[in-house]
């Protein structure tokens, strides 16, 4: 399950007065089974970089492959890619949207084709795995503390059983 970037460049708002070069000629290979950390200053492009891993952002130039296939190839199944390469956003508010926690965590598995009942099994396992208490499953995710929101966001991705898990600032705002 390797991810490889070759000469990846990304520019926000190209050709405008707001043009920003976020990534320039990035070459990176992440072999199967590896744990890696990407560090850098605020605004250095870390979040932009990882959003390329599951095709949330298309590079301005360069290629990205997953298991040897170009993820921007004409016939490539990016929906399947996003099921295999799970991304937890830096800010959980960018990820949470349902009326209650359990429904929010069920969204991904249901989007993958599971029934509501099957999705609930996966969601409950994921929520328990991140230490989220069952008594809070019916709460609105927007009523939770920052740390609880982060746990729900992580559970939402874990419930999809991705082969690769990408965490953007995973410990920021976690409650003890």
What are these regions (language model features)?
Residues 161:
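Conserved catalytic motifs of ABC-family nucleotide-binding domains
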Residues 39-41:
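The feature captures the beta-strand-to-loop junction immediately N-terminal to the Walker
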Residues 54:
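Helix-to-loop junction immediately C-terminal to a conserved catalytic motif
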Residues 165-168:
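Catalytic Walker B motif of ABC-type/P-loop ATPase nucleotide-binding domains
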Residues 117-135:
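Conserved ABC ATPase "signature" region
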């Amino acid at each position: 399950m390797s991810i490889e970037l070759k000469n990846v460049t990304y520019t926000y708002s190209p050709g405008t007065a707001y043009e920003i070069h976020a990534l320039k000629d990035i070459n990176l290979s992440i072999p199967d089974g590896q744990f890696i950390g990407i560090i850098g200053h605020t605004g250095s492009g870390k979040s932009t970089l990882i959003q390329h891993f599951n095709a949330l952002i298309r590079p301005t130039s360069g290629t990205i492959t997953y298991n040897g296939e170009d993820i921007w190839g004409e016939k490539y199944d990016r929906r399947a890619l996003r099921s295999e390469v799970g991304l937890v956003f830096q800010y959980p508010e960018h990820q949470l949207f349902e009326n209650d926690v359990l429904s929010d965590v069920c969204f991904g598995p249901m989007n993958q084709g599971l029934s509501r009942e099957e999705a609930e099994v996966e969601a409950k396992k994921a929520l328990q795995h991140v230490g989220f208490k069952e008594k809070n499953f019916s709460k609105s995710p927007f009523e939770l503390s920052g740390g609880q929101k982060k746990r729900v966001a992580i559970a939402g991705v874990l419930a999809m059983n991705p082969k690769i898990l990408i965490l953007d600032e995973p410990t920021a705002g976690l409650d003890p």
